[in-house]
Amino acid sequence: MKRILVLFALFAAAAGYAQTVEKQTFVYAVKQTDTLRLDRYVALTPDSRTKPCLMFVFGGGFVGGRRDNASFLSYFEYYARKGYVVVSIDYRLGMKKAMQAGTLSEETFPEAWITTLAMATGDLYDATAYVCDHASAWGVDKTRIVASGSSAGAITVLMGEYGICNEHPMAQQKLPQDFNYAGVISYAGAIFDTQEELRWTKTPAPMLLFHGDADRNVPYDAVLYDGNGFFGSKHIADMLTERRIPHWFY
């Protein structure tokens, strides 16, 4: 996963662009003691037409990571130069909170895990709603918002799309009516569900999935335990293939 992002960085650096990509930071939500920000990288295109938007969610095992990590900047700038408005977001790190509170144990882990995913997915939805609310001012086409993420961030964007497709109450509450992402890009992600198979009430957005089969942190295929399932990129791709839903898996 990191190798792929590094390749993007090297490509962008080698291109030798003279223009500087403008970055602006906004607060999109305040939740108790957490002030959540997003960085907007302005698209470098000469015309005034509305632009697609690439949203990015960083990784770090839900215990660490930063939206403005220097290793991601060339990735953001690459897409900004291709005409995308790029948005990199904060989100609450549920596992970090549980560890800091001293409440994380083998017994409490399942509940903490579900809470962590709900936190991250809810924050993604709030950030997406913020982008939609500012779409006119930012020149964003709300029908062309792509969600991307790395590792824990990839889990978050996949969970976000999964919630939309299954009409999860949180998605319906936080997002504009009938909203869906134009696409999902997942670098080593997976979907968790409290049942032993994925379900798609609605057709998901086209997906671009990257995942290494030696990943020790996020399952490459499917892991089933005690009635729950954690479904990695291969399993997702196999199901999308069966349903003839557009996707690419590397």
What does each model-found stretch correspond to?
Residues 1-22:
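Bacterial Sec-dependent N-terminal signal peptides
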Residues 18-49:
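N-terminal cap/lid segment of alpha/beta-hydrolase-fold proteins
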Residues 49-61:
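Short beta-strand element of the alpha/beta-hydrolase
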Residues 66-67, 91-118:
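Cap/lid segment of the alpha/beta-hydrolase catalytic domain
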Residues 67-89, 94-98:
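Short amphipathic alpha-helix adjacent to the substrate-entry channel of hydrolases
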Residues 106-136:
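Alpha/beta-hydrolase active-site loop
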Residues 126-203:
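Primarily recognizes the serine-hydrolase "nucleophile elbow" in alpha/beta-hydrolase
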Residues 171-243:
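The feature captures the conserved acid-bearing segment of alpha/beta-hydrolase catalytic domains
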